[in-house]
Amino acid sequence: MAERLDKPLAWLHGEIKTPPFSKEARIEAGVLLRRIQQGESLALPYSRPMASIGKRCHELGVTDKEHEWRIVYRVDVDAIVIGDVFEKKTKKTPRK
């Protein structure tokens, strides 16, 4: 049986911007990203498609003590591309 390899995480801008997540939020983000890397297709309440941004683009929600964080990512054939990480401050996600 062939071993399935996890898709690597690739940062769109070549850098890792670490928001001030609590330890619990870092663990939650890590677990959810690992599941995506392993090929799992997450749905609400964890992730939702962002067709307005592009094909295969999604928004991953991470709840912290006093903040709602979003990780915008795209599922490519060979990698999971992280486009942005930001604090959610409004009901609507900005298109940028």
What are these regions (language model features)?
Residues 1-68, 77-80, 87-96:
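Basic, Lys/Arg-enriched alpha-helical interface segments
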